[in-house]
Swiss-Prot record:
The record's free-text note on cofactor binding: Binds 1 [4Fe-4S] cluster per subunit.
Protein name per UniProt: 4-hydroxy-3-methylbut-2-enyl diphosphate reductase
Function comment: Catalyzes the conversion of 1-hydroxy-2-methyl-2-(E)-butenyl 4-diphosphate (HMBPP) into a mixture of isopentenyl diphosphate (IPP) and dimethylallyl diphosphate (DMAPP). Acts in the terminal step of the DOXP/MEP pathway for isoprenoid precursor biosynthesis.
Residues reported to bind dimethylallyl diphosphate: H41, H75, H125, S246, S247, N248, S295
Required co-factors: [4Fe-4S] cluster
InterPro entries in UniProt: LytB/IspH
CDD domains for this protein: lytB_ispH
Active site: E127
Length: 313
């Protein structure tokens, strides 16, 4: 059996890697560093950092914290977090991903211009909560690109000028499917919008079109998709490693599963199953591909690959 480790389209994205680097550097110098929420959506990596002294807290605990250092993770935070930090004399180390920070500014600008903002994303994802905070929590969140959830579509005001943006880790095809379906929805509601206008920069065109979209999906993440498809097809079986909380992990695993139905999702080596490494005829499979999400550390992927070689090859 040959075990192939994907080093090209798996492992931390630059935003997460930067956060981890800063956290490690801080922990080498001082103990008692707090992280507002899981520093990354990977439980194994979180436990490693907690063993170094990182203390993970939720929002209620953060609101009660006083005179302490706190790490803002790559997902970013709403303005209310910074206001609380100022009141409670908290020292923030802000590692918001630059791509996310730019998106937060975009949401704020669109709100100031009076747009109804629709975010393609997951309602409770911390990045989405942060983005929504930067537009006074006025955005409408839509997860289902086919507009199949009435709870998501009923709040849409068809009479308002509207802008569509996206959580950075959502799938590109879903974003453009949602754009197309929104165009149809507004047309059925009596607004002949035609194709919505794509904007690169907010506020530069005067006047701004009434119905616009800005593709805010991170290309470092989305560009991994084709490589991951190719990697999945090139191996007989796929072991996909990611945290259960990882939004990006769910998207990338679905890509692997579509390309190779013999794909299996794990968080750590304890979840590996021996039957994954044999054929129905009882023979050892020829190739195993190990890959993961942008929130999966390379050391964990290496650990899984080495474990497979040691116990199943």
């Amino acid at each position: 059996m040959k075990v192939n480790l994907d080093r090209n389209s798996s492992g931390f994205c630059f935003g997460v890697q930067s956060t981890i680097n800063v956290a490690e550097e801080k922990l080498r110098k001082e103990k008692g560093l707090y992280s507002l929420g899981d520093v990354v959506h990977n439980e194994v990596e979180v436990k490693r950092l907690e063993a170094l002294g990182l203390i993970t807290i939720d929002t209620p605990a953060f609101n009660e914290l006083k005179n302490a250092p706190v790490l803002i993770r790559a997902h970013g935070e709403p303005p209310s977090t910074y206001e609380t930090a100022n009141r409670n004399n908290l020292t923030l180390t802000d590692t918001t991903c630059p791509v996310v920070a730019k998106l937060q500014r975009t949401a704020s600008q669109l709100n100031e211009l009076g747009y109804q903002i629709i975010i393609y994303g997951k309602h409770l994802h911390p990045e989405v909560i942060g983005i929504n905070g930067h537009c006074q929590n006025r955005a409408l969140i839509i997860k289902h690109a086919d507009l199949s959830d009435p709870e998501e579509t009923l709040p849409i005001d068809l009479s308002k000028k509207t802008a569509l943006i996206s959580q950075t880790t959502m799938d590109v095809s879903g974003f453009y499917e949602l754009k197309k379906n929104l165009e149809k929805l507004f047309s059925k509601g009596g607004r002949e919008t035609g194709p919505w206008a794509e904007v690169k920069s907010i506020g530069e065109a005067e006047p701004m079109p009434e119905f616009i979209f800005k593709d805010t999906i991170c290309r470092q993440i989305s560009n991994r998709n084709q490589k991951l498809q190719d990697f999945s097809r090139a191996n007989e079986r796929i072991i996909f490693v990611a945290g259960k909380k990882s939004s990006n992990g769910q998207v990338l695993y679905a890509i692997c599963k579509e390309a190779n139905p013999e794909s299996h999702f794990i968080e750590d080596v304890e979840e590996l199953q021996s039957e994954w490494f044999t054929t129905t005829q009882g023979k050892t499979v020829e190739s195993i591909g190990v890959c993961g999400a942008t929130s999966t550390p390379m050391w964990l992927l290496e650990k899984v690959a080495n474990h497979i070689e040691a116990h199943y090859a």
